[in-house]
Amino acid sequence: MTGTPNSRRIDVITVFPEMVEQVARFGVVGRAAERGLIELSAWNPRDYAEDRHATVDDRPYGGGPGMVMKVAPLHRAIQAARAADPRPARVIHLSPQGARLDQDRVARLAACERVIYLCGRYEGIDERLLEAEVDEELSIGDYVLSGGELAAMVAIDAATRLVPGALGHEDSAAEDSFATGLLDHPHYTRPEVYERRGVPEVLRSGDHGAVDTWRLKQALGRTWLRRPDLLAGRELDERQRRLLDEFIAEHRAEARAGNDHDET
């Protein structure tokens, strides 16, 4: 796909290019590509292999199970990706050994004009390729995937959301979970009542100030309940502190009321 001179270019080195290319066909990433905000291309190292079998892996030195991805095909694929655009590219290896991908790192990715994602397979990639070509390693969590493609797709989607013009509503990214360092507040839509569960009255009041206060209170409270680590060391202003204290008091009162009901 062809982008504009100001578009972000994303290249992915993968033995499964069709898998990664799907991310540019749907949702936010698809719309951003259609608008020329991003350009995504996949590069298969098999196309740069040295033999007629397009071999990209070999047995590990020192023995052991599995296969290791070879230096030469990956190196040539990365060089081809670099040559496709004159702008400097940051090469990122998706690996469980990398730094954890969080919203701050996502924002830095979104600010990069060019990123090349390197997706490993098998037992891993020859260390010499990583030493020569990789600028950064990123992980999406402490678990093992079959390859880096899914992690690359996660990073691409998260970063594209922050590219100006990618979302239908410019405030959407600013209000996402983690964008403010807090989890998101609850959301509701029609109908007003579903199986006896209603929408909070404040959201139907038309009072935008009250709605904003309720949403901030819920975001603070939900973060306290589900991800207290995000609040550790965070400096809350007076309003935030008051709203969080109110939420905690209300939550504990509801819990006590529930316990009293269970005992009767």
Curated annotation (Swiss-Prot):
This protein's record includes keyword ATP-binding: no
Residues binding S-adenosyl-L-methionine: G120, I140, G141, D142, Y143, V144, L145
Highest rank taxon of the organism: Bacteria
Pfam families (alphabetical): tRNA_m1G_MT
Record InterPro entries: Alpha/beta_knot_MTases (IPR029028), tRNA_m1G_MeTrfase_C_sf (IPR023148), tRNA_m1G_MeTrfase_TrmD (IPR002649), tRNA_m1G_MTases_N (IPR029026), tRNA_MeTrfase_TRMD/TRM10 (IPR016009)
GO cellular component: cytosol
Entry GO MF terms: tRNA (guanine(37)-N1)-methyltransferase activity
EC primary class: transferase
Main location, first listed in the record: cytoplasm
Subcellular compartments: Cytoplasm
Catalysed reaction, written as an equation: guanosine(37) in tRNA + S-adenosyl-L-methionine = N(1)-methylguanosine(37) in tRNA + S-adenosyl-L-homocysteine + H(+)
Biological processes per GO annotation: tRNA N1-guanine methylation
EC number: 2.1.1.228
Keywords of the record: Cytoplasm, Methyltransferase, S-adenosyl-L-methionine, Transferase, tRNA processing
Function: Specifically methylates guanosine-37 in various tRNAs.
Subunit text: Homodimer.
Protein name (Swiss-Prot/TrEMBL): tRNA (guanine-N(1)-)-methyltransferase
Organism taxonomic ancestry: Bacteria, Pseudomonadati, Pseudomonadota, Gammaproteobacteria, Chromatiales
